[in-house]
Amino acid sequence: VEGLRILDIGCGGGLLAEPMARLSGIVTGIDATAEAIEAARAHAATAGLDIDYRCCTAEALAEEGASFDVIYASEVIEHVTDRRLFAASIAAMLAPGGTVVITTINRTLASLALAKVAMEYVFRLVPAGTHNPARFVKPHELRSEFAGTGIILDDMTGFAPRPARRIGGLHAEQVRLSRRRGGCGGCDRALRHRPRPALRG
């Protein structure tokens, strides 16, 4: 992680950004909610961490010509209105050989029960109305939406977090995407700065 330029899209209060900064990553966190950015900045200051938090969208940041080695968007794309534009913005910001990691909620009955019903109404871990099941994302839809951006699907893994870490667990799709020219493989390898050989074709 040391020295890697890392972008956390939809950073919220900095749950991912802070650990990456502690590992000496050069971290930028963006969120469209001003209150989240204010809270993230305050917490980072208290922890003595140097993180560049900005209240903006991925699309706006891409227009500035920003470039990153690792781009992470966790539980974000299912809230995006134009996913193809979102994918194009990520592609524009990804440095050659860089890695993108996306986690999102698969559109299944199990996900509906857990992410919508359980999380919002049973355990009340997120506000009611947070999730719109119509925007949950099927794997083949992600493949289609990222096609033509210069990013190819490298690895896709379905997972359910352990109940001890998140009540109920969400069935989701963890998608790792890498640029066709010199793509890194899985996120664990990318964050250790040990990329796989360049992909051909």
Locate the predicted segments by residue.
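Conserved class I S-adenosyl-L-methionine
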Residues: L4-G10, T99-F123
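Class I SAM-dependent methyltransferase SAM/SAH-binding core
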Residues: G13-A60
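A C-terminal cap/extension of S-adenosyl-L-methionine-dependent methyltransferases
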Residues: A47, V122, S144, G148-G201
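A conserved beta-strand element that flanks and buttresses the S-adenosyl-L-methionine
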Residues: Y72
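Hydrophobic adenine-recognition pocket in adenosine-nucleotide-binding enzymes
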Residues: V76
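A short glycine-rich, Lys/Arg-flanked "PGG" loop and its adjoining helix->strand segment in the class I
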Residues: L85-P96
